[in-house]
Regions:
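Glycine/tryptophan-enriched, flexible segments
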Residues: 148-287
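Short His-Asn-centered micro-motif
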Residues: 6-10, 31-32, 70-73, 93-96, ...
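Flexible loop/turn segments at secondary-structure boundaries
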Residues: 13-15, 36-38, 76-77, 100, ...
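Active-site cradle of extracellular carbohydrate-active enzymes
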Residues: 285, 290, 295-313
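N-terminal beta-strand-loop-alpha-helix module at the start
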Residues: 1-70
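Short helix/loop capping segments that flank catalytic or ligand/cofactor-binding pockets
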Residues: 15-17, 38-39, 234, 264-266, ...
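Beta-rich, aromatic/charged-enriched effector core domains that present basic-aromatic interfaces
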Residues: 75-211
Length: 313
C-alpha cells in the first residue's frame, strides 16, 4: 500500500521537502474541513483559502500524483475516512504551524516532518537569542544577514550600514502621495461562483482578486512587487494612510503564508532586483529586514515559548 502525504491550506508548495523525494504512488491528502465554511469568517479570507487549496490539488494532479481531496467535519474524521478507503502504510505531513494542530495530528498518528517554510531552524533561533546580549531583533537580524549571506560584502553589510531607518521613516507626502496600484487578477467564472456561494454566510466584501490563488499568481505578484512597487517602499514603509490601504507595500505575506512563495525566493528576487538597479538600497534593506528579520523573529518566539508568553507584558 502507498504512503500518504497530508497537506494543509498554508503548505501549498511542491518545491519544498519532502516533495522531491515523494514516490509517484504517494497519495496526496487534502481535507477541507467544515469550519472553513462556517460563519463568522471574513468572505475574502475564507474564499482565498479554499480557492488556493483547490487550485493546489489540481496542480498536484497534473504532476501525476493521486489526490484525495475530501470534505469532512474535522481532520479526525477526514483522516479516519482516508485510512479506511486507502489503507496507507503511513500518513506524514510537514510540521503544522500551530501547537494545537501539531498536538492533534500527533494524536491522530500522523508523522510530523520539519517545517520547510521558514528560514531559521528552531535550534538556530534558540542559539541566536541565548548567545546575544541583549537578545534584540536587531542583533538577530544582523546575525541572519551574515548566516544567510544577504546584502553582505564578506563580513560587512552592503553600503557599510546595517539599517537605513533614517531614510525609511518619512511621513506621507503632503496630500497623501500617489501610489502604484496593487497587483490583482480577475476571478475566473468558476472562482466567482465559489465566492458567490460563500457570500451569503460570510461577512465582509469580496477582495479575493487582490490576492494570489495559485503558484502562478504568486510568481506574477512577486515580479510585480520587485519591478513596480518595492522601488517606492522604503521611505514610507512605516507610514499609515486613512485613504489608501496598500501604499507601496508588496503584500507578499499572504503568498508566503499560504506556501505559494518561499521566503528565500522572495529574498533572492529582491536582491537580484537591487543588483540590477531596480530597487534602491534603502528600500531593499528595509524590505529584507521584514522577511529575514521580523518574520523569522516572531515565528521563532512563537515556537520557543508556550502560551503563557502572550500575557508576560
Amino acid at each position: 500500500m502507498p504512503a500518504s502525504f497530508l497537506v494543509l491550506g498554508d503548505q501549498l508548495s511542491t518545491d519544498v521537502t519532502p516533495w522531491p523525494t515523494l514516490s509517484s504512488d504517494t497519495v496526496i491528502l487534502i481535507i477541507e474541513t467544515e469550519h472553513l465554511t462556517q460563519a463568522p469568517r471574513h468572505l475574502t479570507r475564507t474564499a482565498l483559502y479554499l480557492l488556493a487549496m483547490r487550485a493546489f490539488a489540481e496542480r498536484v494532479r497534473s504532476l501525476g500524483f493521486t489526490v484525495d481531496y475530501r470534505r469532512a467535519s474535522s481532520f479526525a474524521e477526514g483522516i479516519a475516512a482516508h485510512r479506511a478507503e486507502v489503507a496507507p502504510t503511513e500518513i506524514m505531513m510537514n510540521h503544522p504551524r500551530g501547537r494545537r494542530a501539531a498536538s492533534l495530528f500527533t494524536r491522530l498518528g500522523v508523522t510530523l516532518l520539519d517545517d520547510p517554510f521558514y528560514l531559521t531552524p528552531l535550534d538556530e533561533f534558540r542559539s541566536a537569542v541565548t548567545t546575544a546580549k541583549p537578545a534584540t531583533m536587531e542583533t538577530f537580524y544582523r546575525r541572519q544577514r551574515r548566516r544567510l549571506n544577504v546584502l553582505m560584502n564578506g563580513d560587512d553589510p552592503v553600503g557599510d550600514r546595517w539599517n537605513f531607518d533614517e531614510e525609511n521613516r518619512l511621513p506621507l507626502p503632503k496630500g497623501g502621495g500617489t501610489w502604484p496600484a496593487p497587483w490583482s487578477r480577475a476571478l475566473t467564472d468558476e472562482e466567482q461562483c465559489a465566492v458567490d456561494e460563500l457570500a451569503a454566510s460570510h461577512p465582509g466584501g469580496d477582495a479575493v482578486a487582490y490576492w494570489p490563488r495559485t503558484r502562478g499568481d504568486a510568481l506574477d505578484q512577486l515580479t510585480d512587487a520587485v519591478t513596480r512597487i518595492l522601488p517606492h517602499f522604503g521611505p514610507y514603509e512605516d507610514a499609515a494612510s486613512t485613504t489608501n490601504w496598500h501604499l507601496a507595500h508588496s503584500r507578499l505575506s499572504v503568498a508566503m503564508n499560504l506556501g505559494l512563495l518561499h521566503p528565500r525566493e522572495v529574498v533572492d528576487a529582491v536582491v537580484a532586483a537591487y543588483n540590477q538597479g531596480l530597487i534602491p538600497l534603502a528600500s531593499t534593506e528595509g524590505f529584507l529586514r521584514q522577511i529575514i528579520g521580523w518574520r523569522e523573529w516572531v515565528w521563532g518566539w512563537h515556537q520557543l515559548r508556550d502560551d503563557s508568553y502572550r500575557s508576560l507584558n
